[in-house]
Structures are given as structure tokens and as C-alpha cells.
Amino acid sequence: MKPDAQHVKQFLLRLQDDICQTLSAVDGANFIEDSWRREAGGGGRSRVLRNGGIFEQAGVNFSHVNGDAMPASATAHRPELVGRSFEAMGVSLVVHPRNPYIPTSHANVRFFIAEKPGADPVWWFGGGFDLTPYYGFEEDAVHWHRTARDLCQPFGEDVYPRYKKWCDDYFFIKHRNEQRGIGGLFFDDLNTPDFASCFAFMQAVGKGYTEAYLPIVERRKTMAWGERERSFQLYRRGRYVEFNLVWDRGTLFGLQTGGRTESILMSMPPLVRWEYDYQPKEGSPEAALSEFIQVRDWV
């Protein structure tokens, strides 16, 4: 099967619709849509749910950009892309709940293809999902990783362990020497064994996100919380901001190549705080988080 960008685009548009409808049904609030065009080619649909019953902010973004040539920053490490037109498309989302006992979640699936006459296209898929709890619950982490493992199973026994490790390695905040959360799946440059298999895997990851996340939301949404939990949640959200602005390749690439800033920064939490030399009280649930987010085999 030859790479079919149009087929991928239709799936991504449906995936954005499905995820937004599912999150709206859980929350009770609706997304607002902001459609945009990119002068250099392409555009997208940014959707945001704000101040909902459960989600303080949820952003679900679809983008499809194209051009006659790749920027020099992208071809420096990939000389085979020089002189090719390209298309890049994907769905990216981040959900920031209000209740500190519900973790923040992030998911992304994407496709890239570069073509020139008389040559085979260069293409690959990427994506994944990861979870960032503020208070650790083992059953939530096990469910998240079991869902990830089960969706990987049809594609090979080594797929889950490989992409789990990649996720743990990627979502590491080097300047803090700590994980961003408990990980999940992360893959990139996927183009073997063939287009159909890779596309099927990307679809499984995209659809698997809500199956992994929503049972956790349902389990935690009625838990009572107060000022202490909220203060800790806002402090830990600072780590999310630090990772995205300092280390995340997608954020940096988007900002450095003239991407749409509002859509790129849609992943930012609406409220966040920093505190100099914060130390949680010994033996407290807040202190337990640093141990909980250590890399381990959850399933």
C-alpha cells in the first residue's frame, strides 16, 4: 500500500471530532473552535474547552501544513529531504483538570511525507500519550500502562517495552533531574514494515488515549480537595511549563519555524505557580510524588 496522506488526514479530522465529543460528554462544557490558515501553506482547527465542570482547560489541535521545501533546520540532519515538497499533519492535545487528584494528560499522533518527482516518498509516523499525576494512585498508573500495552500487543511483543522506554527517556526534565510524569508511549520515525501497518498502529494509539484516560477521570472526579492540593497542583504544573518550553522538540520546532503560536502554546496550563526551594512536608502525599514518578514497570 502506497502512502496515502489524504486517508491519514481524514482519520485525524475524525479523531479530533471523536476526542472533543467524548471530553465534552464527560465534562458538560463545549469546545470553541478556531480555524486558521497558514500563509506558507496549510492550516488547522484549534479547539479549546475552558472552565468546564471537570476540565479547567482542554486543548485539542489539528494541523496540516505543507510547503515546497523544508526549512534548513529540518534538513540539516536529514539530507534526503533537501529539494522535496512536504506535508506534516497531526492531532495534539493536553487536558488540565481542575481537581488535583485527576492527572494531566497529553496525546499526539502525526504523519510526515516529503516527495519529489522520480523518487520514492520519504514518510513516517510519530506520536504517543503520557500521564502527569499530582497525587499518585497505583491503580490509575497500572490501568494507563495496561491500556498502552494491550493496544501495542497486536503489533509485536517488543513494541510496548520499546515505546514505554522511549517515553520515559523523552519526558525527562534534565535541569530538575526528574520525570515529567509516569510516561506511557512515545514513538517517532515509524515507517516499517509498511505504510498500512504503521498507519494502523498510529490509529490504535490515537483511539487508545480516551480508553486509557477517561476511567481515571471517572474514578477521581468526585474526590474532595482543598487549598493545599490546589497549591501543590499549581506548583507541579510549573514542571509541565518548564519541560514544554525548554525541552519539547515539537514546541521548539513550531516556534522556531514560524508556527501558529496560539496553537503551539495551547498546551500551557491556564494557571501555574513557582516557589523558591519548595520542599513538601516529610511523609505527606505531596512528598510521595517524587518516588511515584520514578521509572518502573507498571505492568
Curated annotation (Swiss-Prot):
Its cofactor is a divalent metal cation. It comes from the Bacteria. SUPFAM superfamilies: Coproporphyrinogen III oxidase. Homodimer. PROSITE patterns: COPROGEN_OXIDASE. Belongs to the aerobic coproporphyrinogen-III oxidase family. Substrate binds at S92, N108, V109, R110, G258, G259, R260. The gene is hemF. One of its GO terms (cellular component) is cytoplasm. This is Oxygen-dependent coproporphyrinogen-III oxidase. Keywords: Cytoplasm, Heme biosynthesis, Metal-binding, Oxidoreductase, Porphyrin biosynthesis. It catalyses: coproporphyrinogen III + O2 + 2 H(+) = protoporphyrinogen IX + 2 CO2 + 2 H2O. Gene3D superfamilies: Coproporphyrinogen III oxidase, aerobic (3.40.1500.10). PANTHER family: COPROPORPHYRINOGEN III OXIDASE, MITOCHONDRIAL (PTHR10755), OXYGEN-DEPENDENT COPROPORPHYRINOGEN-III OXIDASE, MITOCHONDRIAL (PTHR10755:SF0). GO terms for biological process: protoporphyrinogen IX biosynthetic process. One of its GO terms (molecular function) is metal ion binding. The active site is at H106. A divalent metal cation binds at H96, H106, H145, H175. The keyword Metal-binding applies. The record marks H175 as: Important for dimerization.
